[in-house]
A protein has these predicted regions:
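Generic short N-terminal amphipathic or hydrophobic helices
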Residues: 6-7, 30
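Catalytic-core regions of core metabolic enzymes
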Residues: 26-499
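N-terminal leader/targeting segments
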Residues: 3-6, 35
Length: 499
């Protein structure tokens, strides 16, 4: 359905955006001044000042310092609080003015009314990056909105950048910079190629078990109220970040429609950009305003903008932590021909139905491959390679499993593989599977999405975890597995200029 021509404000002060001739267009209403988008001080600081409560607990400046030390941060840490002399073995300074050394980044975990004066002190110290963890700003009331405007004005005049307010901050596991203001419950994150940014602290380490998920992170950023640093700034920063392969975002609003479209069009062909946007309904849009002080974007127009820019739009919160893995851990699909190896024919048929949604077609195995499979077990060389029948009657099943998978992966008629594994109730099977997957890691240029199931939840979890460690992304169900392959295929087509 073609969206009707409609005007919607996608910014507090910048542009009016609408549909015009089948494209996302913006007309100026004031000018949003794009400032320095080199955000390296937020993710690669050499020195950090932490201003706020240093009382031991599950939240506050004490926890920021503790998580930095636990993660192995190599830079200098300057705790600031007039009531302390030492914390966690570090000297505490009475005020920011008492620190003679250069400070790259400041954390403000203080009462909202104290933030403007502290921002002025930061300006006097020529500090260029501030993370305002404190809440109670535009998301709360009129006084908070005025305070937010005040700190933004101070920052602009001083050439400072702000993340927040009302934020859980950032993380960069590639260098041990994980300054979480909340107690995490684990020491560090798995380093990988996924950058995840959001208007919620739900993506920060204290809220999600990244260590258990084997979700390889390059950067994390909670925008908070995004009074300054926003989605466009992060897209531009991550565009050239050598650690980031795929960019994932949760957004409640778009501040500058014109800039968002321009930046997305430039970044998306280089790196996949996956976005989940809330506020799809009128009620959801209303509530998002009270959450971060956002001004919601018309969902239909946002969807059209994503399509125009080449952004992959996510449907569920869980997909933020599932679908990006296919881009981080696997090579891009060479084409849309899908191979299926399963333990039951029913799963294979369901997979074919799902695949059609994304333009994937089931691979027809070559006569040579079919003959090889039929030699392993009668009638095995079909479109859906069903391993269930041989498993039921062959004593040395694990011996032939490797032959079956190798034969399928060597077939040139297949570009990507939906790989279904049944763990069995026996731990010995898991070890045999893993022995095989270690041998084939990186050997075949096929995009592989794996779904693991079985009668023992602990065994399924163990094998899933160890497969992820080997670089084979495991998904929670059939549908998500096929969707991962589907969006990877669609992105590959667009990158080649075919869409």
């Amino acid at each position: 359905m073609k969206p009707t021509d409609k005007i919607v404000n996608v910014s507090h002060s910048s542009h009016l955006c609408h549909w015009q001739g089948g494209a996302f267009a913006c007309g100026k209403r004031g000018i949003y001044m794009s400032r320095n988008t080199d955000l390296s001080l937020f993710f690669e600081p050499k020195s950090v000042a932490v201003i706020g409560s240093l009382r031991e607990g599950y939240f506050g400046g004490y926890v920021v310092i503790k998580t930095l030390l636990n993660a192995g941060f190599k830079g200098k840490i300057f705790p600031v609080n007039p009531s302390y002399q030492e914390v966690l073995g570090l000297k505490v300074y009475p005020s920011l003015k008492d620190i003679s050394e250069k400070i790259d980044l400041v954390f403000l975990i203080i009462n909202r009314r104290s933030v403007p004066d502290m921002m002025r002190t930061c300006a006097d110290k020529r500090i260029k990056a501030v993370i305002v963890v404190a809440d109670g700003f535009a998301e709360r009331d009129e006084e908070g909105a005025k305070l937010q405007n005040e700190i933004l004005k101070i920052a602009k005049q001083a050439g400072m950048r702000i993340i927040g307010p009302n934020t859980a901050g950032v993380a960069n596991p590639t260098n041990g910079f994980i300054p979480d203001p909340y107690e995490m419950g684990y020491r560090t994150l798995k380093t990988g190629g996924i950058a995840i940014c959001a208007q919620t602290g739900m993506i920060n380490p204290q809220a999600f078990p990244y260590g258990d998920l084997h979700y390889g992170v390059s950067k994390i950023c909670d925008y908070g109220n995004k009074c300054d640093v926003d989605e466009c700034d992060m897209l531009e920063y991550l565009e050239n970040d050598r650690h980031t392969k795929v960019i994932t975002m949760y957004l409640e609003s778009i501040r500058d429609g014109r800039r968002f479209l321009e930046v997305s069009k430039r970044v998306a062909p280089k790196k996949p950009v996956l976005i989940l946007k809330s506020g799809r309904t009128k009620e959801g849009a209303r509530v998002s305003t009270s959450h971060t002080g956002s001004l919601a974007v018309d969902d239909q127009i946002f969807g059209a903008a994503c399509k125009q820019a080449g952004i992959i739009r996510l449907e569920k919160f869980s997909e933020l932590f599932e679908l990006p893995k296919i881009f981080d851990a696997q090579p891009p699909p060479r084409g849309g021909r899908l191979g299926i190896v399963t333990f039951t024919g029913g799963v294979g048929v369901l997979a074919i139905d799902e695949a059609a949604k994304y333009g994937l077609s089931v691979s027809k195995l070559s006569p040579e491959t079919s003959a090889k499979l039929n030699a392993i077990f009668p009638d095995l060389g079909k479109t859906i390679v069903d391993i269930g029948p041989p498993m039921a009657v062959i004593d040395n099943y694990m011996d032939i499993y490797s032959k079956i998978l190798k034969t399928v992966l060597e077939d040139d008629t297949m570009d990507c593989l939906f790989n279904v594994i049944w763990t069995s109730p026996f731990e010995s099977f898991v070890e045999e599977y893993l022995k095989f997957y270690r041998k084939i890691k990186g050997k075949y240029q096929r995009t592989i999405a794996t779904w693991i199931y079985g009668p023992s939840v602990p065994l399924v979890q163990e094998m899933s975890s160890r497969m992820e460690d080997l670089g084979f992304p495991v998904f929670p169900d059939l549908e998500t597995s096929i969707k991962a392959l589907g969006i990877a295929y669609q992105y590959a087509i667009r990158k080649k200029g075919g869409a």
